[in-house]
Amino acid sequence: MKVAFLKPPVGGILGLEMLTFVEPLGPICVAACLEQDGHECRVLDLRIDGEEKGMAECRAFDPDVVGLQCNFTTERNRTIRLAERIRREMPRAFVVVGGHDASRDPDWFRHDAVDAIAMGDGEEVLPPLVNALSEARDLKKIRGLEVRDGDAWVSTGAADARPNLDSYPLPARHLIARYADHYYINFRKPLALMETARGCPFKCNFCSVWKFHESTFREKSPERVVQELAQITADNIFITDDIFWMNVRRGEEMARQIKASGIRKYFTVQTRTDIICKFPHLIEMWKECGDLAIFLGLESVTDEGLKAVNKKNTADNNVQAINILKDLGVGFTPNFIVDPAWDRDDFTRLREWIDKMGAYNSGFSILTPLPGTDLWDAAKKNVTTDRWEMFDIVHAVLPTKLPLDEFYGEYSRLWRHALDVRYKHRGKLRTYVQLGAAVATGKVSFGELNRGLGMAKTFTRPQTFLKAHES
């Protein structure tokens, strides 16, 4: 059968997805399994092609099955709009919606334009679904789906999670080769995504990853990781593991094997500060594999704040980890959660902490109850909007303690303060010289740089966020 995977076009209120623009890793992993079964696949990234060109190519391909990936709550409406268009223009195609958001709240996607909703690991759901369609078998016997049964919808039960991730084929990167130069992170391109593990054993209340994976944690072997790295031509790698180095011995062995292979990349990883504090030697080992940058979900500068989101970490670990990274010369990007219930003192405390620590690359997410999280279950009755585009973690969808304009005044001031701290610690001239060098060497285009700087400046203005509440 012919299967097309479509990534919906750019949308949202502020176009935040354009700041970090990454490849559709899920679809190319699923497509690899389908190709192994003898099916013909295409991956169309409408964020790059544009909707008209992408849809024209899809019609020319004439797929039997169209898969739409909806990973983020903000993508919901445009995913359904795209499904409706596919239904009009390719009426014989079977439309299935998958992705993280569809998995955590499948009932929302029960729509006339959708034939099935895939839940869980796509590699375990899509191949059996496509094979059943090709043989005209009963879809209700395929696990991991919500499917139509006349006018009703039927859940087929959860698909099993495969313990051995090494048994999956390598991602079908040839299907997105033409897009490779378009993907980037933090002004670095080209960028490839890579997964070395799935799941998370922690249970933060704002996150649905641990629920999606039912609190399991599965890993690929170091040998498989090196095999995947050898497949990737991009110089920059973002490792998608929610917590890197969970298994310390595996982290050490991966570093040893990558170094021995001669592969050198610019790695961006996500991890916890308690891991850095306990095992700083891991940072040193991975520095020998190329360059390293670390995203840190600090969430709060107080133990009370960490306890409120069930982080199972301490404010002291956050401080200690940053000092370790500074001593080792490793770049880091801290992210903090801004609670709508904050008063001015809370904002002041965070600004003072950033100034003290020199945490100039900080980012700030507004506490947002996303469907499928414990926070959603606890707070959904208090949500102030039904516009899913507002759930982009930079808009308040819960009541604010401060008047809304004052809340956004303080919120935008955080972004402005982080920029000021950067200039203080790194120097404004040095910052712009580094960015200019990135353009000159082709690591980023002038347009991408201009867009990123423009977005950073936009975030320092309260009206940027307020205007979404006025429409």
Per-segment meaning from a language model:
Residues L14-P27:
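Glycine- and acidic-residue-enriched helix-capping/strand-helix junction motifs
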Residues V22, L170-F336, P340, E352:
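Radical SAM [4Fe-4S] cluster-binding motif and immediate context
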Residues G54, A255-I258, R344-Y360:
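Short, electropositive alpha-helical surface patch
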